[in-house]
Structures are given as structure tokens and as C-alpha cells.
């Protein structure tokens, strides 16, 4: 198993903290986001990591290549990171993702390492880390059936307050089998971009595939674990209170 980390974004809402560095280089309690994530992956047995870089990509590439010489670190460039979204960053790593089962992670997260281990050790070939809805959650939600199969993806514009107790937030960490990636997901992403462009989210394709029954995706609950997604300086302050 390998990991793909999406780290091309600008992180403009973090202000001066990302003036000269990629978003994932921001420290949380003295540890950079990207260092925390790579160390957790290494402790979980992952040795090959593909990082998709964009904003301040050369600085990030040089930093990681020098720091993690004991690992198989590979880099993919998104030269148009400022006019595309993460669906395109993911697609740029498609040749690597055809080689092995893959963990897909976004680089602006702090998580408990046990969340990664639960995902890796799950017998499900294709799975997503999810967390019961909380008021601070933003972005895509999912619903699940009694067996923790994800039954729908719900974009923010389609939220219904009365249904919030049924919602789970996607943590933005997934496990995909090589077969699913090669036979289904990557071709679907390519077709989606040809039809609708490159400025969208990879979860939109998962949404459509789930609705049409093209994927069986298991939800792995992060209930009881600490995690946070960092988009703003306010998020950073919260993250520093809840993680070591």
C-alpha cells in the first residue's frame, strides 16, 4: 500500500503563514502539518508516498526530499494549481495510483494515528474515514446505512438541518484498491473533467458513483478520535488546543 498526499493548494485564508510556504508547512504546536502526516504514515507501515505539489512546490519538494531520504518520496507537479481544484491534482497522480492500493489524504489535516490504522486494517477494499456531524464541520457530508456503507454524498448546498443527526463528515482520507482505481475511479475522473472541467472536487465523482451504484464504499468512524481540518487561523488555534 502507498499514500498520495494532495498538497498543491495556496492556503490563502491562513494569511502570512502561507506567504512563502505551502499550506502543509504550517506548524501545529511546533510540528508542520506535512511532517506529522508523513511520520504517521511511516509508523503505519507506508513507505512510498506521492506528494502532489503546486504553490511553493519547489520549496516543499526540496524540504521533503532532504528530510525523508529513508522513504520512497515521489513528487507530482500541478503547474496550474491556482486555476484548478483537487480533482485535477488527484488526476495528475493517476499513473502512480494505478500501481498499488492507495491511501488518499489531504494535507491540511491533523489526526490521531489510530484513525489511519483503523482505515488501513479495515477489511473493506474501498473505505473513507468519517466523523459524526458536529457544528464546526464544513464541506461534504455522507449518510450511511446500518452496515456503515456510504449511501450518499451530500454537498453543503444540499444540507437539511433536520437531517444533521444522520450526517457524517468526510475526514478527507480514503483507502482505494488498485482495481477500483484502475477500472473505475480514475476513468470516471477523466470523463468528468472532459465534460465539466478541472475546477471541482474529487468527491463529486464519488458522489455520482455512489448514487449510481458503481462503488461500494465503507465508512470507518472516527468517533472518539481527535482530528481537525485547518483552513483558517481560527482553525489553527482550535487544532493547537486539541492535538499534542
PLM features: what roles do these ranges have?
Residues 25, 142-144, 219:
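A structural signal for short hydrophobic beta-strand segments in well-ordered beta-sheet cores
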Residues 20-35:
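Short catalytic helix/loop segments, enriched in acidic residues and glycine
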Amino acid at each position: 500500500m502507498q499514500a498520495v498526499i494532495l498538497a498543491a493548494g495556496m492556503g490563502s485564508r491562513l494569511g502570512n503563514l502561507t506567504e512563502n510556504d505551502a499550506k502543509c508547512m504550517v506548524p501545529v504546536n511546533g510540528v508542520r502539518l506535512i511532517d506529522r502526516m508523513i511520520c504517521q504514515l511511516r509508523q503505519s507501515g507506508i513507505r512510498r508516498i506521492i506528494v502532489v505539489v503546486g504553490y511553493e512546490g519547489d520549496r516543499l519538494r526540496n524540504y521533503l526530499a532532504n528530510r525523508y531520504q529513508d522513504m520512497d518520496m515521489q513528487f507530482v507537479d500541478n503547474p496550474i494549481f491556482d486555476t484548478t481544484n483537487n480533482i485535477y491534482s488527484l488526476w495528475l497522480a493517476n499513473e502512480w495510483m494505478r500501481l498499488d492500493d492507495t491511501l488518499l489524504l489531504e494535507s491540511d489535516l491533523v489526526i490521531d494515528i489510530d484513525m489511519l490504522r483503523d482505515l488501513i486494517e479495515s477489511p473493506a477494499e474501498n473505505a473513507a474515514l468519517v466523523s459524526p456531524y458536529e457544528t464546526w464541520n464544513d464541506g461534504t457530508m455522507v449518510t450511511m446505512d446500518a452496515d456503515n456503507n456510504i449511501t450518499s454524498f451530500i454537498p453543503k448546498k444540499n444540507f437539511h438541518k433536520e437531517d444533521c443527526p444522520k450526517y457524517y463528515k468526510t475526514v478527507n482520507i480514503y483507502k482505494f484498491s488498485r482495481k477500483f482505481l484502475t477500472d473505475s475511479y480514475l476513468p470516471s475522473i477523466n470523463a468528468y473533467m472532459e465534460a465539466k472541467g478541472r475546477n471541482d472536487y474529487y468527491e463529486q465523482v464519488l458522489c455520482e458513483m455512489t448514487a449510481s451504484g458503481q462503488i461500494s464504499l465503507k465508512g470507518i468512524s472516527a468517533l472518539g478520535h481527535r482530528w481537525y481540518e485547518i483552513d483558517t487561523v481560527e482553525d489553527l488555534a482550535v487544532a493547537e488546543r486539541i492535538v499534542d
